[in-house]
């Protein structure tokens, strides 16, 4: 009797942790991705990177630019694999119009936040973002450090009681 393969609990393929550090995220939207077969196989193997990716608009359509999906070594040899190709985002017209209008405001951009599986479909969570200044980043770090210190103090206070 063979053992069943244990499936990982997490459906997340790739995260863009840098985006939350560098930007204020105003709004989040889920979008589908138009992928080729070798890209799906590579994503299942966890070979995706969205750290420097963002959304661009061309001819009324949205595209994910800068995402890197490395091809597997065992991928087909007769297909040319471009790891950094621009991938089309699958959104309905209302979402596209809304995103386009919001992104055209001063200081706003659209960045990829995470790449994950939703049942059998690959989805990307994109966020409407506004850039942070250096002082804002410092404030976030101070706030995070204070939270850790406060938790440590509370933990020690409960032990002494």
From Swiss-Prot:
Pfam families: SmpB. Keywords: Cytoplasm, RNA-binding. InterPro entries: SmpB, SsrA-bd_prot, SsrA-bd_prot_CS. One of its GO terms (cellular component) is cytosol. Disruption phenotype: Essential, it cannot be disrupted. One of its GO terms (biological process) is trans-translation. It is found in: Cytoplasm. GO terms for molecular function: RNA binding. Required for rescue of stalled ribosomes mediated by trans-translation. Binds to transfer-messenger RNA (tmRNA), required for stable association of tmRNA with ribosomes. tmRNA and SmpB together mimic tRNA shape, replacing the anticodon stem-loop with SmpB. tmRNA is encoded by the ssrA gene; the 2 termini fold to resemble tRNA(Ala) and it encodes a 'tag peptide', a short internal open reading frame. During trans-translation Ala-aminoacylated tmRNA acts like a tRNA, entering the A-site of stalled ribosomes, displacing the stalled mRNA. HAMAP family: SmpB. Belongs to the SmpB family. This is SsrA-binding protein. It comes from Haemophilus influenzae (strain ATCC 51907 / DSM 11121 / KW20 / Rd).
